[in-house]
Amino acid sequence: MKWTTKPVVSRKVEETEFELECESRTVPGIMWRPEKHGENGKLALLGHGGAHHKRSEYVLAVARWLARSHGIASIAIDGPGHGARLGEGLEPDFSEAWDAEETTDNIVADWRAALDEAQVKLGVGTVAYWGLSMGTMIGIPLAAVEPRIKVALFGLMGFWGLNQKQLRTAAPLVTCPVRFLLQWDDEIVPRERGLMLFDALGSKDKVLHAHMGLHSAVPMTTMRKSTVYLASYLCVD
């Protein structure tokens, strides 16, 4: 992990951008941690949605809530064909980014490499995953193979889309506690497909949180409560 910016502190949260190499791919990311940080190793992995990136406003909000309110560090990396992985001035093409059969395996490898490097910097501790929409397309296959992830927040996704085959395989292998967010009037992911994905998750400790509204209309209060959920597992001594 190579730092690409100097640390910037705002309202008691330190932010630093980084890059790392994984299987010849450059992986751009950001780390957030409390200004007065130790090395307790508590870490959340933040996966952004399609057409977004590692610095999207809701990702920043989640990272800052975790650091400021719970003392938890977090990292985010740009997903396939998004953010700094694109050429300057280009817009993300969701279908093109996920067209290759190996896309899921590659982004899972990138996340595991980022976790390895983050633990060198932060120490080894409890790890959570937080990701909605495309973040769930990535997070479920990741949690299925990564035993360091002890709790996860998923949602806004179902057995639908370009990696649904991988989701069907991975979902039963996810055994950590899960909170799953579902927008009842989702115009992108059919409700029944989201319910099918929730039902398929192998975790014996899972909760479904449904809210009226369209795909991107998750209330900020629900977003904030999702960080409290992660902290309830990460902050147990």
Indicate where each model-derived feature is located:
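Acidic catalytic loop of the alpha/beta-hydrolase fold
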Residues: 161, 184-189, 216-217
